[in-house]
């Protein structure tokens, strides 16, 4: 099918605290769009403040799909996201609207737009083996091993990203092939015309300031109390993907007495900066991206121009 005759979907991706949500809501209100969230933290219920989830007032103005769809005790994979996103895209198109996919979870965007290769299922024995090695040698040693077998993934996965680092090693030990080799397989192209936007400030200092200000606002809004409520649940712990979300882990460890309040604030802001850096690294290698500068008053007009 010619791309001009295909239905259009819009993606708006960017690092945390770059202004994606406000811009997406403005576009949704002017362009008959409906928003699909592309965020691995916003999927969880009862994780509102630390995930910067849109408020009820904002959601009433511009509803978001794929928010509050999982309990924090549950898992949710990139494959789950791809399936859910496609189902919601089809529902939005059937209603005569344009799907607007907004977020900063680049793995979800990649899964949707490029498809997923059949990776091996988790192997608990190998995971336990990796955990023992980490306990003995540390994460940097595991990252050094990854660099030997898969330098491309090693460049992309930070030593302080335990979930993705251990998974990359696990995949290799199960299959004998690197994550990069296995993900070369491309799925059939989506039957949509995809118009892609990235948003970020030109000056990284501006982003760092926004990250710090937003985290302090979260604390004023009751973020510590939110984590206390989650921590009180017997079924939640720090090994769950939900509790590994940036900010939640650091506040949890503060509540465990691992460090004082000021250290928690500093660690949370640094971890959020590291997340933003990884997001920007993904985006710099993204093809066919129309760049917008955070806070530019012409952004909405540029979006509307591309979307007509």
From Swiss-Prot:
Catalytic activity, as annotated: adenosine(37) in tRNA + dimethylallyl diphosphate = N(6)-dimethylallyladenosine(37) in tRNA + diphosphate
Sequence positions that bind ATP: 14-21
Site residues (Interaction with substrate tRNA), renumbered to this chain: 105, 127
Cystine connections: none
Obligatory cofactor(s): Mg(2+)
One biological process term in Gene Ontology: tRNA modification
Keyword vocabulary terms for this entry: ATP-binding, Magnesium, Nucleotide-binding, Transferase, tRNA processing
GO molecular function ontology, one term from the record: tRNA dimethylallyltransferase activity
Region (Interaction with substrate tRNA): 39-42, 163-167, 244-249
Enzyme Commission numbers on file: 2.5.1.75
Keyword Nucleotide-binding carried by entry: yes
Uppermost EC category: transferase
Binding-site list for substrate: 16-21
Protein's job: Catalyzes the transfer of a dimethylallyl group onto the adenine at position 37 in tRNAs that read codons beginning with uridine, leading to the formation of N6-(dimethylallyl)adenosine (i(6)A).
NCBIfam families documented for this protein: miaA
Quaternary state and interactors: Monomer.
Family: Belongs to the IPP transferase family.
Protein's UniProt name: tRNA dimethylallyltransferase
Lineage of the organism: Bacteria, Pseudomonadati, Pseudomonadota, Gammaproteobacteria, Alteromonadales
